[in-house]
Amino acid sequence: MTKDELIARNRKFAIEVIMTIELLPSNRVYDALVRQLVRSSTSVGANYRAACRAKSTKDFINKLKIVEEEADESSYFLDLLREIDKGKNKEKLGSLLEESNQLVSIYVASLKTMREKLKISKN
């Protein structure tokens, strides 16, 4: 997957999260979880764009670690919302959870590759 494709995928993920949460009920519990989810899901793309502008491999790795953490946090809040949802949003929340988990896997693999490259370049 190219950098531009991943930027587009992150953007699509954030937009789908935002559109889905508009369908959820509003109460204290949902509102608290939704606020956290909006922050983490939109941070995935924003922080990936920042990582793409990194000054060095080490800087890229540090920024990409934040991206991975935000994607994982999004998975957590999507899982909670899917579990407590009593409406017809379980399927969509499950689909978003799957996408979030795939993004986590992509970033974990990318981090592993970059760390190996950094090790090789030091030797």
Where are these regions (language model features)?
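Short, C-terminally biased terminal segments at protein or domain edges
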Residues: 1-43, 47-50, 54-123
